């Protein structure tokens, strides 16, 4: 009998947990070179937004993003689908509509059969079709580990762009997916995942964040991002620092995937959690070990974090309900604290 290939055994990292830590990334992106100024580039990398946005000058803007990583699941088709869903999410997180995807593939051709890569790309193509776009091309290289993702192009009405820098004090914070993806996938890699929890993380990662396009039509949605490799706290800090605000997170309102707390107790915490906390732990209040494991857990293809003004809360809740999204409140934004603490966890 042919032995089943487990893709996660061919990579040192998994999904968005492969991300370089925020601290190290800051060093990499620092440059002494004079910045090139383009007045039409209305969102660049200054505010850690999910994608770049270029104003065409006719009321429409182009959104451009890329995202790729190593396998977080063993099944090739699911890996391709998750990676593509995650990449497309950046367009939705800016409030836009995707129009085209380009594949990015790295594959160890001397280790794994080409048929595995074919299934990975097919998974990506399936996700693109779900989003209503074509997988229009791509580029591939021979690499030591499997890598897959997309470069995605989208469009948006220029005035509807949701930036990290546009959040307002007093906004309530909502999430569209439960946390714990990194914990469940780590439990699976360690062989500790119970049968009743099989597929939970994959289902969450394959849920398309297309609701972001609808949220962007609500003026009271002041900022939006997808929660991925830096965890909920890391991406919330990006919004706070971009908008010169602070935040409070209500730990008792955080929703997690089934079994997450039991797996934390068994030590199924991904390495990315510690790297995340090392990068921004000094910016958050005191956390229990369980809170740290959940709030710093690197999500792959995680949910949207949405900042909503009070007069638009019901509208956003209704949009989510109509779309079958289990929206839940996680905190609120407040004026910038005088201390170094950006996010307080209660």
UniProtKB/Swiss-Prot annotation:
Binding residue positions for ATP: 19, 47-49, 67, 90, 138-140
The protein's enzyme class: transferase
Active site: 16
Protein origin, superkingdom: Bacteria
Pfam families to which the protein is assigned, alphabetical: AIRS, AIRS_C
EC number of the protein: 2.7.9.3
Binding site for Mg(2+): 50, 90, 226
Keywords: ATP-binding, Kinase, Magnesium, Metal-binding, Nucleotide-binding, Selenium, Selenocysteine, Transferase
Keyword Transcription regulation on entry: no
Keyword Membrane: no
An annotated GO BP: selenocysteine biosynthetic process
InterPro entries: PurM-like_C_dom, PurM-like_C_sf, PurM-like_N, PurM-like_N_sf, SelD_I, SPS/SelD
Catalysis performed (reactions): hydrogenselenide + ATP + H2O = selenophosphate + AMP + phosphate + 2 H(+)
UniProt similarity note: Belongs to the selenophosphate synthase 1 family. Class I subfamily.
Physiological role: Synthesizes selenophosphate from selenide and ATP.
Name of the protein described by the UniProt record: Selenide, water dikinase
């Amino acid at each position: 009998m042919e032995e089943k290939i487990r893709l996660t055994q061919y990579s040192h990292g998994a999904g968005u947990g492969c991300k370089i830590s925020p601290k190290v990334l800051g060093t990499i992106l620092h440059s002494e070179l004079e910045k090139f100024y383009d007045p039409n580039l209305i969102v660049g990398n200054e505010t850690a937004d999910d994608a770049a946005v270029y104003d065409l000058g006719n009321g429409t803007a182009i959104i451009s993003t890329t995202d790729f990583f190593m396998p977080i699941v063993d099944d090739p088709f699911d890996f391709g689908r998750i990676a593509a869903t995650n990449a497309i999410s950046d367009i939705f997180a800016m409030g836009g509509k995707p129009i085209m995807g380009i594949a990015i593939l790295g594959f160890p051709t001397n280790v794994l059969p080409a048929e595995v890569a074919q299934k990975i790309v097919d998974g990506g193509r399936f996700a693109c079709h779900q989003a209503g776009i074509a997988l229009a091309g791509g580029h591939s290289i021979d690499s030591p580990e499997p890598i897959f993702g997309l470069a995605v192009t989208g469009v948006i009405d220029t005035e509807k762009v949701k930036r990290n820098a546009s959040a307002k004090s007093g906004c309530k914070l909502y999430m569209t997916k439960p946390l714990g993806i990194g914990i469940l996938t780590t439990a699976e890699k360690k062989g500790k995942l119970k049968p009743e929890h099989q597929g939970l993380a994959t289902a969450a990662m394959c849920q398309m964040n297309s609701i972001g396009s609808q949220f962007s039509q609500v003026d009271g949605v002041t900022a939006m991002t997808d929660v991925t490799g830096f965890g909920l706290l890391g991406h919330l800090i990006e919004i706070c620092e971009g908008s010169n605000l602070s935040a409070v997170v209500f730990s008792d309102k955080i929703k997690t995937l089934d079994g997450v707390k039991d797996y934390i107790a068994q030590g199924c915490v991904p390495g990315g959690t510690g790297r995340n906390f090392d990068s921004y732990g000094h910016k958050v209040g005191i956390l229990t070990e369980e809170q740290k494991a959940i709030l710093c857990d690197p999500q792959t293809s995680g949910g949207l974090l949405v900042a909503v003004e009070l007069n638009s809360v019901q509208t956003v809740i209704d949009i989510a309900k109509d779309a079958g999204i289990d929206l839940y409140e996680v905190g609120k934004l407040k004026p910038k604290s005088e201390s170094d603490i950006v996010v307080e966890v209660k």
